């Protein structure tokens, strides 16, 4: 099992940041590895809402496991999706902006010996993506690692 966390400060109000992040369909706007996120349930943005995510090299089904508006959001993969993932994001209003703490717990299916390498690689991607989220929300535009230019 791989676990890590990172944090980012975004100079935007917590209500704006949370609403943007909680809209899972917007993940491809700040995560270059994700191509699309499509709702698979009638209700979206609530506990139990489900989504299908297509990434560069795989696909997952996701579920909103917990949501406390403007405070926390927990997303999990739905078995048999791989990697097995639980992502918990907490949001705090701070100095007129928002601090996000992003905690990951995942089973990537790699041998235990390779977990540190896999964890470092995953964490590096998360750090880059949080930086892209910050830039997009603060400036209204961002260029992702794959060259896509995104505007809000």
Task: Please name every model-derived segment.
Residues 14, 42, 65-70, 90-99:
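A short, structured loop/turn motif at beta-sheet edges
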Residues 6-8, 39, 60-66, 77, ...:
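Hydrophobic/aromatic beta-strand elements that line small-molecule binding cavities or substrate pockets
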Residues 1-7, 50, 59, 72, ...:
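Intrinsic-disorder/low-complexity, polar/charged segments enriched in Ser/Thr/Lys/Arg/Asp/Glu/Gln
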Residues 16-21, 27, 51, 64, ...:
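Hydrophobic pocket/interface hotspot
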Residues 78-128, 133-135, 144-146:
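Beta-strand/loop substructures that line and gate deep hydrophobic ligand-binding cavities in soluble
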Residues 49-56, 74-80:
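Short beta-strand segments that buttress and anchor functional surface loops
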Residues 1-41, 132, 138-139, 148-152:
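Hydrophobic ligand-binding cavity/cleft-lining segments
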Residues 32, 56-59:
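Short coil-to-beta-strand transition motifs
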